[in-house]
Amino acid sequence: MAQSGSMISGVAGRYARSLFELAQETGAVSVVEGDLVRFEEMLEGSEDLKRLIKSPVFSADEQLKALGAVLDRARISGLVGNFLRLVARNRRLFAVPQMIRAFREIAAEARGETAAEVTSAHALSAEQERELKAALKSVVGKDVTVKVTVDPSLLAGLIVKVGSRQIDTSLKTKLNSLKLALKEVG
């Protein structure tokens, strides 16, 4: 695979690249990406699963056994199941969220797209998401895949991350900036 121009590096980048190359060789990139997205959604929805992958208290065997049960229940097998088990054996589960993000970026780049992570104060409608994709496409010059997460603490607005660039139009950030400006004056 040609070296990508993205900023993906480190442990997560190496694991993600290896998984992508295997998925590409077997023609299963979209299946692998779908399984990774499902696992990511499970992670976001379960504090216990987050604790399992982040806590050094669990031994590799305990993590592997618990992860195996989770993967079996979620019917995640094949490349992604084997990949996550390998990551657990190598004591790298803490980096799985970054690995998933890196895989998505690599897959998007291979499709001629770029990946954007959007954090919004409220859920976006299909129309808003479509308009956001169009606006981002006009800026980056490529089709954009968008992963939207909701964070009510932003109050209003968006935080958009594309590659190493971030645009923060959230009300929370604007209020914090105003607060700092008022402290400097007073």
UniProtKB/Swiss-Prot annotation:
Keywords: ATP synthesis, Cell inner membrane, Cell membrane, CF(1), Hydrogen ion transport, Ion transport, Membrane, Transport. One of its GO terms (molecular function) is proton-transporting ATP synthase activity, rotational mechanism. The keyword Cell inner membrane applies. It comes from the Bacteria. Its main location: membrane. GO terms for cellular component: plasma membrane; proton-transporting ATP synthase complex. SUPFAM superfamilies: N-terminal domain of the delta subunit of the F1F0-ATP synthase (SSF47928). It is found in: Cell inner membrane. InterPro entries: ATP_synth_OSCP/delta_N_sf, ATPase_OSCP/d_CS, ATPase_OSCP/dsu. F(1)F(0) ATP synthase produces ATP from ADP in the presence of a proton or sodium gradient. F-type ATPases consist of two structural domains, F(1) containing the extramembraneous catalytic core and F(0) containing the membrane proton channel, linked together by a central stalk and a peripheral stalk. During catalysis, ATP synthesis in the catalytic domain of F(1) is coupled via a rotary mechanism of the central stalk subunits to proton translocation. F-type ATPases have 2 components, F(1) - the catalytic core - and F(0) - the membrane proton channel. F(1) has five subunits: alpha(3), beta(3), gamma(1), delta(1), epsilon(1). F(0) has three main subunits: a(1), b(2) and c(10-14). The alpha and beta chains form an alternating ring which encloses part of the gamma chain. F(1) is attached to F(0) by a central stalk formed by the gamma and epsilon chains, while a peripheral stalk is formed by the delta and b chains. PANTHER family: ATP SYNTHASE DELTA CHAIN. NCBIfam families: ATP_synt_delta (TIGR01145), PRK05758.2-2 (NF004402), PRK05758.3-2 (NF004406). This is ATP synthase subunit delta. The gene is atpH.
